[in-house]
Regions:
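Extended catalytic core of nucleotide-activated donor transferases of GT-like folds
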Residues: 47-148, 154-155, 494, 499, ...
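Donor nucleotide-sugar binding/catalytic pocket of nucleotide-sugar-dependent glycosyltransferases
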Residues: 145-186, 265-266
Length: 556
């Protein structure tokens, strides 16, 4: 009996991004079982990437290399969503013939699989990033169309179940874990002394990129409120492992505004040795203590630190805080807990689940506001409450604080382990019956010629009638009746305009959220007809290619 074929769509597993790390760990677990044939379709990996030579499963790089035609390179560069794999997905499918396709990314990174002409040939198991509520109707409709849906957190699962009316086939959580380098360091005083930090300091730390949703202005204000509320604040420090300059907050301006220049540590990276060192803010570039040369910069995505070094940095903290207006997960909370550091986090989005699982302290937001771009709620933090919780934490005896750190570590071991997360995927894969002869890929071709466009529409034709005719007679996909696709088509025909998209495809308006650009364009029956013809023709072409490929493989 053949093994089930699993295709994971994500970022190249030789990278150190969040998606890449998660995929690498899950695929390593699945590969270790020996039960599956595995392949990855790798964003940001080249077709014949040398970094993939030691990967023990099949590798399909998304980025065209020198072996590709100029036309393919041009197609890739012209469409921003090509980086996620949409341009090569059908070709990969015809080469690998997956039984199950998986994806763990944001909506606009994964929805191409739902729209694929081959969707009926494979099971689709997804774990989308759910970082706020409510989720857009189009997103929920897509997740509902999947054969199975996992989430990063319990909170996200509750959101999807509630919004879909329990119509999503939700099968549980499969959260990420921390790298094995994240371990408690018992002698915290010696560690601090080695970095030139007061061994008796009281340090609140965070590891967050300098982004809009990471609430550095509020965190700085909350810390200022803490300093003003204690009798002697000389030993209190905030440690921010973040980037500057970046597209986010003006760090030096915030330090000046809240008079914190001597109270906030940052991580700098020596340009010559790559070694990190903590320092008060000294600008975007400063002198390295290792070489004496100028040019050390703050940590960033491009100049990051090794897991072992970040573990040491986290072990400098007495308390870890995740101060964001939303999170799809917030992995640094788990990494801090793995180091035995107590956790506090905004009590909203995935942080609701994570902070409780880690036996930390939820920080109730003051309010939620609805974001214009996404329609999702974001948290407004209560900085006075946060300052009070910080103060209460440090008023406890050291023995109690150490006990809380031990409990955080135990909670990490209980809830966030790679083998436990891998088993969630494994359980679903093992529930699927596969065809020994790849019958799922040998189904009859679905080919329909679009109905010719009428020279003139009948009088009093409603937009509902037009939409239905376009779907049934031009597109030829009756399953889209009574779907989000139909309701959106009716809406846009009625309003006579539509939202532009990064993908250039009418039917995916939400992909514009990928880069924040949303503009409206005219829309009428003629444009709608042309779009339906395009989708229909693309489906027909790939279906003909599939049938030809099956004949080559199986000699039918």
């Amino acid at each position: 009996m053949r093994k089930p074929r699993i295709l994971f769509c994500s970022e190249a597993t030789f990278l150190n991004t969040g998606y890449a790390t998660y995929t690498r760990e899950i695929l390593n677990y699945l590969h270790s079982t020996g039960k599956y044939e595995i392949a990855e379709m790798a964003s940001y990996g080249e077709r014949h990437d040398k970094n993939a030579k030691n990967i023990p499963w099949k590798f399909y790089g998304v980025v065209p290399d020198d072996s590709c035609s100029q036309e393919e390179k041009q197609q890739y560069n012209e469409n921003p969503t090509s980086q996620f794999g949409g341009l090569i997905f059908e070709s990969v499918c015809l080469d690998f013939l997956p039984d199950i396709v998986c994806d763990i990314r944001d909506f606009w990174m994964l929805d191409f699989a739902e729209r694929s002409p081959f969707r009926k040939c494979f099971k689709w198991c997804i774990m989308p990033t759910v970082d706020a509520r409510p989720q857009a109707r189009q997103w929920v409709a897509t997740y509902q169309s999947a054969d199975a849906c996992l989430t990063y957190s319990e909170w996200a699962g509750d959101v999807l179940k509630q919004q879909s009316g329990d119509k999503i086939n939700y099968i549980g959580i499969s959260p990420p874990s921390a790298h094995g380098a994240y371990q408690p360091i018992i002698d915290k005083e010696a560690l601090r002394a080695s970095y030139g930090i007061n061994p008796n300091a009281k340090i609140i730390g965070t590891v967050m990129r300098n982004q809009r949703r990471k609430l550095y202005p509020d965190l700085f204000q909350a810390f200022r409120l803490l300093l003003d509320s204690v009798e002697d604040n000389s030993d209190y420090y905030l440690y921010c492992h973040t980037s500057y300059p970046d597209l986010g907050w003006d760090i030096p301006e915030l330090l000046q505004q809240y008079q914190l220049s001597s109270k906030v540590y940052f991580t700098y990276i020596c340009a010559q040795t790559g070694r990190p060192f903590p320092s008060l803010f000294k600008g975007a570039l400063t002198q390295s203590p290792y070489t004496g040369q100028y040019g050390a910069s703050l940590s960033s995505v491009k100049t990051g630190v090794e897991y072992e070094d970040l573990s040491k940095i986290m072990n400098l903290f007495d308390l870890y805080v995740q101060y964001a207006n939303c999170e799809g997960f917030g992995l640094p909370q788990v990494e801090a807990a793995a180091c035995g550091i107590p956790i506090m986090a905004t009590d909203y989005s995935a942080m609701e689940s994570v902070v409780r699982n880690l036996r930390g302290t939820p920080l109730t937001p003051k309010a939620l506001y609805k974001e214009l771009e996404t329609g999702c709620f974001r948290a407004v933090p209560d900085n006075h409450l946060a300052a009070q919780k910080f103060k209460e934490f440090f008023e406890q005896p050291i023995s109690i604080r150490k006990k809380q750190g031990f409990e955080a570590r135990q909670a990490f071991l209980e809830h966030y382990q790679w083998d436990k997360s891998g088993k969630a995927w494994e359980k679903y894969f093992d529930s699927i019956e596969i065809s020994e002869n790849f019958d799922n890929w040998r189904v009859p071709a679905r080919i329909k010629l679009p109905h010719p466009k009428p020279e003139q529409l009948p009088n009093n034709t409603t937009t509902q009638q037009l939409a239905r005719w376009l779907i049934l007679e031009v597109l030829g996909e009756p399953e889209r009746i009574n779907s989000y696709f139909e309701s959106r088509l009716i809406r846009d025909l009625t309003y006579k305009n539509y939202l532009s998209t990064t993908g250039g495809m009418y039917f995916n308006e939400s992909s514009a959220a990928f880069d924040g650009r949303q503009t409206r364009h005219p829309f009428d029956f003629n444009i709608a007809y042309d779009q339906m013809v395009y989708i229909c023709t693309r489906r027909n072409t790939w279906e003909e290619t599939r049938i030809k490929r099956m004949k080559e493989i199986f000699k039918d």
